[in-house]
């Protein structure tokens, strides 16, 4: 049993703060009923950051911090040595396939060493840049849930090199494939990538769930129903393998038999 101490939640692409607030709502509470959590977010757009601050206040989380600036160019949460501050839990839904991710930085000489040992993401696609920022921002036993487009699971070249390096370190422990048309502003199907740095050497594989078919149509959007969410959570927590829906896949199978390709339909 983990001792009751204040754990922090961080969202490097905070937007209006809704994901951060939901993550904070899941934190344990103390005897006085106060959540044992500190909240930190960064959002580059001034107006959106203002909205996030207001959102925190409206949800009784006014002590949460939202800082403004581009996270990849100018991360605002640093330690006393000028390196990235480490967080226990990170949630993030970054801009998909961010074409301007490297504006203002020289990735080869990144002062925060986010790409060391992994490789440089493609100039016009920042999906892995955001992912590697999260990895570098996690404590030694830190955990993260990141919403990403499916492309990061199988695209080749520089991204394949990075993906294989991440796989070799056994940091990814879960992938949940979601229905298309779930998010505003994009019809691209997304997935949740679960990261766990704690005792990574002991991890056996990635637990994959294909939840792409469980949804309700709502106008031109798709929505996850309560039962869809419940099924995902139950299956994931129990690591229950269900034919055509979920499976534990070993790192060896992914790296040796499939060249580091993590596309969920390949395995389920």
Segment roles from a protein language model:
Residues 84-268:
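A conserved structural/catalytic subdomain of Rossmann-like adenosyl-cofactor enzymes
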Residues 3, 7-92, 97-106, 112, ...:
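Conserved S-adenosyl-L-methionine
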């Amino acid at each position: 049993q983990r001792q009751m101490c204040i754990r922090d939640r961080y969202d490097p692409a905070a937007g209006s703060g809704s994901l951060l607030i939901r993550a904070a709502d899941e934190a344990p509470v103390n005897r006085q009923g106060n959540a044992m959590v500190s909240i930190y977010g960064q959002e580059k757009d001034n107006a959106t950051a203002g909205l996030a601050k207001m959102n925190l206040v409206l949800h009784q989380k006014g002590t949460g911090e939202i800082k403004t600036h581009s996270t990849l160019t100018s991360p605002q949460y640093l330690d006393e040595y000028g390196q990235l501050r480490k967080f226990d839990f990170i949630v993030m839904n970054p801009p998909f396939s961010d074409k301007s991710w490297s504006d203002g930085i020289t990735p080869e000489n990144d002062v925060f060493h986010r790409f060391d040992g992994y490789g440089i993401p493609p100039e016009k696609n920042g999906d892995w840049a955001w992912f590697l920022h999260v990895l570098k921002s996690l404590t030694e036993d830190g955990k993260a849930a990141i919403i990403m487009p499916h492309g990061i699971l199988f695209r080749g070249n520089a991204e394949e090199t990075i993906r294989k390096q991440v796989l070799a370190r056994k940091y990814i422990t879960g992938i949940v494939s979601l229905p298309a048309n779930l998010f505003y502003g994009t019809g691209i199907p997304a997935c949740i990538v679960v990261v766990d740095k704690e005792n990574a050497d002991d991890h056996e594989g990635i637990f994959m769930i294909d939840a792409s078919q469980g949804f309700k149509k709502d106008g031109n959007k798709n929505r996850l129903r309560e039962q869809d969410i419940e099924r995902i959570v139950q299956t994931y927590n129990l690591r229950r393998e269900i034919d055509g829906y979920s499976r534990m896949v070993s790192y060896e199978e992914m790296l040796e038999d499939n060249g580091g390709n993590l596309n969920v339909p390949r395995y389920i």
